């Protein structure tokens, strides 16, 4: 579980970094509200928003799955989520070539896998 908490904390820090990036870009480009139609501003906003859209649900599902699966599965899923979200952010901001595709694909596959794992685990629970 320690790996899960470290990854969750690092994802939280990534949210902070992307938030600061949007704020600084707003000041630099003099865009107070919205995206001003600026492609770089749009990418910064979407990198931040996409992390907020996916990370909390994925973290919750991984945490729930930790009741059914061991340390290594939970740790592996946590690290994959962190790497996928970092790749996506880097790709959106033009730092990591193919990062957007790899990050989005990795996140979507992880979300599907953990969801299926929980459904299967739920059906295998004993009735009390």
Description of each model-found segment:
Residues 116-128:
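Juxtamembrane boundary at the C-terminal end of a transmembrane helix
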Residues 58, 65-94:
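Mid-chain, well-packed structural core segment of small domains
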Residues 87-113:
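Interfacial loop-to-transmembrane junctions
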Residues 20-46:
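Cytosolic, membrane-interface loops and tails of multi-pass inner-membrane proteins
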């Amino acid at each position: 579980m320690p790996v899960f908490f470290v990854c969750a904390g690092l994802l939280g820090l990534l949210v902070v970094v992307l938030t600061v990036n949007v704020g600084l870009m707003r000041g630099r480009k003099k865009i107070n509200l919205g995206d001003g139609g600026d492609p770089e501003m749009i990418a910064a906003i979407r990198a931040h928003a996409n992390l907020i859209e996916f990370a909390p649900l994925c973290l919750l599902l991984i945490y729930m799955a930790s009741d059914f699966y061991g340390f290594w599965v939970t740790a592996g899923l946590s690290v994959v989520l962190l790497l996928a979200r970092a790749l996506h952010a880097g790709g959106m901001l033009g730092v990591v070539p193919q990062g957007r595709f790899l990050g989005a694909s990795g996140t979507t596959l992880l979300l599907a896998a953990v969801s299926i794992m929980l459904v299967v685990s739920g059906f295998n629970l004993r009735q009390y």
